[in-house]
Amino acid sequence: LDRIERALKEIQAGSPVTRGTLQTTFQSKAYDELRRLGLTEESERIARSSFPGQTGMLVVDQVIPGSAAADVLAPGDILLRIDGELVSQFVPLASILDGKVGEEIDIELERGGRRIVSQVRVDDLHAITPDEYLEFGDAIVNRLSYQQARHYNRAAEGIYVANPGYLLSKSAIPRGAVIVEMDGEPVRNLDDFEAALDTLSDGERALVRYVTMEDPQSSIVRLLEMDRTWYPARRCALDDSTGFWPCRNLAEGPPPEPPAVGSTRLKKYANPTVNAIAPSLVIVTFDLPYTLSGVSDRHYYGTGLIVDKERGYVLVDRNTVPIAIGDVTVTFAGSLEVKGKIEQLHPLHNFAIVSYDPKSIGTTPVKQATFNTEPLEPGDDVWVVGIKSDHQLLHQKSTVSSVDPLLLPLSRTLRFRDSNIEGISLVNAPNEVDGVLVDKKGRVAATWSSFMLQSGGDAAQLNRGVGSEVVTQFVETVRKGRPFYSLEAEFVYSPLFAARKMGVDEEWIARLEENNPTRRRALSITRLVAGSEASRLLETGDVVLAIDGTVVTSFRELEAAVQKPEVVVTVWRNDQVREIPIKTAALDGRGIDRAVSWAGALLQDPHRAMAAQRGVDPYGVYVAYFSYGSPATRYGLWAGRRVVEVNETPIPDLQAFIDATKDIKHRESVRLKTMAWNGTVEVITLKLDNQYWPAYEVRRTEAGWRRTDFGS
């Protein structure tokens, strides 16, 4: 405890606790080993007589490259004296170094039987121990510490990635990497790194060179894209007098340059079918800055289909663009990449539309896809065409094996899940790529879409085709700005013999058979969306017979029939026919448009998937995510719960939550009434920490997404 006692006395006296280092690791070795290293008999005799109770001396084990001692010391050197004083133990060595910070010392060594006397500067250990960090794009970096430098066996300089966050993970720069260059300029410390970031505007790119501990001798180059939209850029330093880490904002950077216009040529293919569809296919990448709506993975890519050349509309599945907040890029022919934006998410099905600026691709000869809306049947020949992750086109002839209801398990994280749709299965289908199914003329007969599914603790994806009639209706609805009308119920197909067992009379059985003589089925309600009018008027188990007097026996027939504000639903319930007028729900495709971070928890209004899958009332605010180490973690404000009261004040929505919490001070306690998805109530108390976990809101505006702080 010698050095601890010394540090305590210095602190009690109000003096700085100096720490010196040679950036060298020493080991204590026995005389037997020392003799093999070249310790002379005279030096051993002097050491044994001076310290008769000791059995060895100190030997250099490692010297940090680039340090002041690197040109003087070498592994295997035996330490004899410092400034004429014989040193053979760690405590006297530390005592000398702590008292000589910034000074030159005389050091005497033996190396292979030769005596070496030299001078070396004692470095300040505090100067190479991080006491500040830089935060940008949700990433946290600090100067490479002396302790990490020992592991890397490199100089204690460069920028260590403590947390890659959103921005660096987007650039595939991992945790533990050491950044050594930005755009060809060396980066030795945080000042260098901050200066490099200050020159970057929002969205501007820079080349980053880094090394990893796994392969420190080989550097890797990645492209970093600066973010000034989703997260602040700031630098925080330890204040020894208070123990806090106050922060200052970095420079805002220059204004963004107008996007450059580029053009590329498209590859020609020998197969005329592939050649017809290839100009309509692109790669879409999506990066998610926040964990919201049950979606936690941050980076996605998939094949997009150009459905409107004039508007720049591109159709993708919702396993490529799962929610409405994030960064989108569109890549043409593996050569030209442009920025995109999210236009609409289909509120019911596995589709989204993103857009690019048609002017940004110059004369690139893209084409708008044409569609064949005739339903595919088992035995039909199709060509599967999509783009792989390496931007190479894959095309394969296949045959439709079946068209079946797509029944996906309920999402474990309450993310979007498709329902009331039929999926097309193929013979020997390619599962490593998504894209389209085209006929021999190159017309799109169906998409070949990727569906995310969660079963138990595992997540997987499933590829199925979806008929182009669903796509064309979606595109037309988005073009005209119309809402999507939904009955807000989930259905399954019931064979007519099952409908008979439910008591459906012969007249209706005959009408159902006449409507669909091939498949002979009826629609039965299996789940209702909580909070909807249908949840009050319909019941699970109802057999739906007709909409507005027209018999419906398929998902598509029913969905088309309810595209109006109000319908009359004819159902069979309890051995009788009932005609029930119901107002349909008008859904838009905007998706989420605001979220709040509070006490380290990410909050949002309850999204539709909660009501549709688990029957959760759309009341309160939903905890989408919590950050480790935050008050939300310490006090048990877990993800998946809803906050319905704050200090006994009802919280119907996100705005009510903001109003109820904005005046709560730092370190004040607050009572929260929370509910789990199954209705379990728990009241917790939480103490705010506005120093390290300030509250902010992310909101979509006409000018794009904006982040603003709120609270005390």
PLM region descriptions:
Residues P375, S389, L393, P430-N431, ...:
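Short capping loops/turns at secondary-structure boundaries
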Residues D2, G14, K388-H391, L453-G457:
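Catalytic-center loop of serine/cysteine hydrolases
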Residues R3-P289, S296-T331, S335-P347, A352-V366, ...:
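C-terminal recognition in membrane/secretory proteostasis and scaffolding
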Residues D2-L8, H395-V403, G456-V475:
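Conserved, short, structured surface segments that act as functional micro-motifs
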Residues R143, V382-F416, D605-M610:
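Chymotrypsin/trypsin-fold serine protease catalytic domain
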